[in-house]
Amino acid sequence: MNYNFNWTVIEKNIVPMLEGLGFGLLMAIIAITVGTIIGLLLAFAAVSKSKIARKLVQIFVTIFRNTPILILVYITYFGMPTIGINIPKVPSFVITLALYSSAYMEEVFRAGLEAIPKGIIEAGQAIGLSGTVIKIEIELPIMMKKVLPSMGNYLISLFKDTSIASAITVGELTYISKVLTTQTFRVFEVW
């Protein structure tokens, strides 16, 4: 079988492909930003003294980490309208991705918080700092240094997860590539 590559398909469609790439990156950045904030709050709740808070975080993290993201996307996009909540496809996907990422970020941040030596926290308490000041001024900077590599790795993984948006016809790179493949029959060049 002889296959003749035709790279003009890419040349003619580079703009929509780059737009899809940019849109996927934008969705990933929004989701990781929101997910990081929620994950940080969940991590502080996970290491708090409140048993109820710890248990609620554990349930949330267990559900979101153990459910495939495609199922979560389908529940958000197709399931929510059955109970009267209609969310457009892009916000639906970004919300799902943000909650999904917050469960993973919570684990990263919790590990970072647990790696902080207790003596540093006790030193802050000894000089009269409040619990909030200790968390913001002492724990947060130390933890961020420890978790930054994991966060970078997860951002890359989350960007790859944006391809799942094509399942609900969000126009990111994977969806645009599928459309181009259907229109041009140039599978190898597009992918």
Residue locations for each model-derived region?
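Transmembrane alpha-helices and adjacent helix-loop boundaries
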Residues: M1-W191
